[in-house]
Amino acid sequence: MTNYAIILAAGKGTRMTSDLPKVLHKVSGLTMLEHVFRSVKAISPEKAVTVIGHKSEKVRAVLADQSAFVHQTEQLGTGHAVMMAETQLEGLEGHTLVIAGDTPLITGESLKSLIDFHVNHKNVATILTATAQDPFGYGRIVRNKDGEVIKIVEQKDANEYEQQLKEINTGTYVFDNKRLFEALKCITTNNAQGEYYLTDVVAIFRANKEKVGAYILRDFNESLGVNDRVALATAETVMRQRITQKHMVNGVTFQNPETVYIESDVEIAPDVLIEGNVTLKGRTHIGSGTVLTNGTYIVDSEIGQGSIITNSMIESSVLAAGVTVGPYAHLRPGTTLGREVHIGNFVEVKGSHIGEKTKAGHLTYIGNAQVGSSVNVGAGTITVNYDGQNKYETVIGDHAFIWEQLDSHCTFGSWR
C-alpha cells in the first residue's frame, strides 16, 4: 500500500491578526505545521507535498527537505489548493491524505486508523469526521437513510435541516490518488463563497456510484482547526495536558500539573519530581531522580540525575549528576557543571566550566572561566572578564579558596 500526503499551508490566517503565516504559530514549542507533519509521518508517506502561498519562504524553511512544495498564488479554495499538488502526484497509484496545516491536535494514531479504514472498506474517498455539540461554522456530513455519506455541505450553503446535523467535516480526507485529481477537474465555483470546494468531489464520486465513507474521531479535540488566537489558546491547553499526562504515565510526578509548561521535545526520565510553575522548553533533558522546585525555568539544557534545581533559570547548559542549583541562580549559555557542584543563591555563571564538587554558595559572578574541582568560591567573588572590547578567560585550579574580585587573564593554581 503506497501512501501520499498533501498538507495545505498556503493561507494567510487573517483572523490571527499577525504578520506570521498562520501555520507557523506555535503550540507547545512547535509550529502547527510541524505538529501536523509529525503526525503525517505515522502513515509513512512515499511523498509529502506541502501547498504554500502567503510568505512561502518562511513556511518552506520549517520543513525544508522533508517535503516537496507547490505554490498556490491565488487563494481560491481548498479544491484549488489540492489541484496545485497534481504536478507532484499525477498518475501515481495509491492513497492520498489531504490535511490542513492548522490542525495541530490531530494524532498520528488517528491518521493511521483513517488510512486503515479507507483501505479495509475499499473506499474511493474517506472523510475524517467528528461529532460536535455546537457544529456552527463547520461543514456538515449528510447521510442517506442507509447511513451512507452522500455529500458535505458548508455552513453558508446548508439548509435548515442540514444546519441541525451534528456530524462535521474535520477537513482531513483520504482519496484514491488518481480519482482525486480526475474529480477535481469537474468541480466549479458555483457556491456561496465562489471558491473551489474540495468537498464537492464527494458528490461527484457518489454520482459515479463510487464508495465514499466516513471515519469518526473518538476525541473531538483532534478536529480543532486554529483560525484565531482563541483557538490557538485552546490548542495550547489541550497539548499541555497531553504532554504532562504522557510524562506522568512514564513515571514523572507533578505536584500541580495545571501550572507547568513543558514543550513537545522535552525529555524527562522516571522519578523526577516537578513542583508548580515550572517551565521546560526546547531540547531539554531531565535526568532521573531530579527535583525541580517552584518557579524553575530551563531551556535547551541537560540536567544530570539526582540534581536539585530550586527556583532558578538555566539556559543552554549541561549539568552532571547530583548538582544543586539555587535558589535564584542563573546559568547562562555555555555553562557546564561537574558532578555534585553547588551553585547557590544569587550566583550567575556564563560560558564557564566548573569542576566536580566545587561550591559557589552566594552572590557570585563566574564568566568565561575554567574552575577546577573541589574549589570554594566565596561570597562576592567576580571574574572580571570584559575590558570593553574583548572577553578573557580566568582559570582557577583544583581545591582553591577564592573570595574576591578577579581580574581577567588571571590563572590561579591548585592548592595542595
Swiss-Prot record:
Signal peptide region: none
Chief location category: cytoplasm
Keywords: Acyltransferase, Cell shape, Cell wall biogenesis/degradation, Cytoplasm, Magnesium, Metal-binding, Multifunctional enzyme, Nucleotidyltransferase, Peptidoglycan synthesis, Repeat, Transferase
Region (N-acetyltransferase), start-end ranges: 251-416
Amino-acid positions noted as binding UDP-N-acetyl-alpha-D-glucosamine in the UniProt annotation, renumbered to this chain: 8-11, 22, 72, 77-78, 139, 154, 169, 227, 332, 350, 365, 376
Binding-site residues, acetyl-CoA: 379, 385-386
Subunit details: Homotrimer.
Name of the featured protein: Bifunctional protein GlmU
